[in-house]
Amino acid sequence: MFFRYGTKETEYLKARDARLKSLIERIGHIDSETDPDLFSSVIRHIIGQQISSKAQKTIWNRMLDAFGVLTPDVIAAAGIPRLQSFGMTFRKADYIAGFASDVLRGKVDLGAIERMTDEDAIRTLTGIRGIGTWTAEMILLFSLGRPDILSFGDLAIQRGLRMVYHHKAITPALFRKYQHRFSPYGSVASLYLWAAAAGAVPELRDYAPLSVKKGKSLKQGATALPTSQSVSSRSANPRT
């Protein structure tokens, strides 16, 4: 499945912002994979923290090959050593095993999370060991399909904003301005900012001072794309 959006969302954003309009028209529609199964999505995002998308995919595929469908019963029964054998750290294996146990015991109600507002869902998800605000926001976007997620904690979003709008830095106040401008379709804006940060428009450059760029690598919370997702774009009139 892909994150669902269409003309309504893009036309709204294009009317709100000339530079984003240019970016949307240049890149075309973006297909971004989603995982509607909240349980497996949480696991996938925990695995992907602070590692490359390639490494995450390798670990994830090993788990799928071993277990088939990931359920709380299967993961809880596997135990930490078995989870580690797929290539993840002890800490991540501990988080994942604990999460599965909490779901089984009813401590974490996934159905309730799906029905919550964005704010309440983020608050609840960050109460789970191993999940911070950035991870919770990515789960809302790429599992629950929430339409208005723009993450200040994602350094690639900040990079995309710098590149598109020629800023040297993105302060919280400046970020809130863009968050308000793109609402209620911040998630769609995120897709295009990630694409810009990943080099979809070659002539765009990062305006951050060189010392800042050298000090920040593109990893979790700073990814060119969220590590658990595959994104491709298609345009009726591609430009080079």
Question: Over which residues does each language-model region extend?
Answer:
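C-terminal accessory module of base-excision DNA glycosylases/AP lyases that mediates lesion recognition
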Residues: 1-30, 94, 133-240
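A positional/architectural concept
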Residues: 8, 15-68
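Alpha-helical ds-nucleic-acid-binding substructure associated with the helix-hairpin-helix region
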Residues: 19-23, 51-52, 56-129, 181-183
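Generic, ordered loop/turn and secondary-structure boundary motif
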Residues: 28-33, 40-43, 76, 109-114, ...
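A general alpha-helix detector
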Residues: 41-46, 78-82, 120-124, 156-160, ...
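Short amphipathic alpha-helical interaction patches enriched in hydrophobic/aromatic residues
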Residues: 46, 79, 83, 107, ...
